[in-house]
């Protein structure tokens, strides 16, 4: 029989993989007949690996040291017409073009750029220049031959983070209000602000008056809201306000407000997300962007205080739904970097506020019914809600709902309206959407592992995350607050972690398979 393992968490290091044999001479695709050596570095600390190179029969310039002088629009169109044979606005190995283009160098000669990768890099550089409104540009050949991993990392660091950064204030509202998921007929933009934040309400109403182009309506959100209230908001979905900071004008002394920046996932997801933000922050901290990594922690504290949970995202249709909990580890990582980067400042007040918010979230969200199961002491994903989730694409539930629409002899849209407002009762459909909401809260959407049963499952990942919460809280109270945080003591939290481990071993451990499995509470 296998030994009974102790409960592990995702943060514990896995054993190292065995070293793989490495080829003596790396093979690279070249269009040169002679050895050209390594590429010139794109930056001082990131030298690119060689890619497929360009050729030039009219110049003695060394490859990768050349610079091309190009007309942005003309070259962009010529490159697409010649190389993008499948019309997807990209250049890939699927395209059937000649994989070669001739460009002028800054010295007046011509050079041929060859190969899928270099042409794709050229297209990307031209697209970036077009977005910036540039008509002419100089491109270094080294940019086009840059190692793809270095290139991607550099572009994330220098472009993508900033392009995906949002702020909910006068300067940032136009960009962040956009919601591709909004299928309502309401054409004006809506911003919901907690009713107990009068300064924020006044600020946003002033912005709405001063910026009629935003077509913005600002509404106060009550302190407490029911599933019925949130369902009715789905007819007028909007953005939910999050944390702001007050700023004082040094010249006039006037007090104004500014949104705290955060990074969005992008595409259809143009708002602050819960566990997305944690993993985004890991990259931000790696790239030295503490300013952007800290913001979501402040926003999550605000959400717990005003919306009673860290929401799936800060749109009105997410008001009742959370996501996998990462706040304690998130806080620890940011706090450690704050202390390292600004050792002369006292960061304990910030840590205390975040830790107290995490304790509140732990108790009121994950250790309260319906998410908490009193019989086992374990927790599950189980958000409240009524009706069909409105943020999905229009046809997402069509096949599911069509038989019900036929039963009531109406269109799918009409049946959805009746079902959402309780005019028809379908227990099987209620059960389906109970689990569907839980799947979305779990972050596992979509997965056959949890499909149609998620609200019944004490999943191993959620137990591990809450175990991490309990240990994190205990260690921070002990190490940072002399074992007393407003009456909270580490021993109690360590015991909670030990209890969870015992319950997980009891209910989720499969002795025969030697693995932990989700436990069906029903």
Which ranges hold each PLM region?
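Acidic, mature catalytic/reactive cores of soluble proteins
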Residues: 1-522
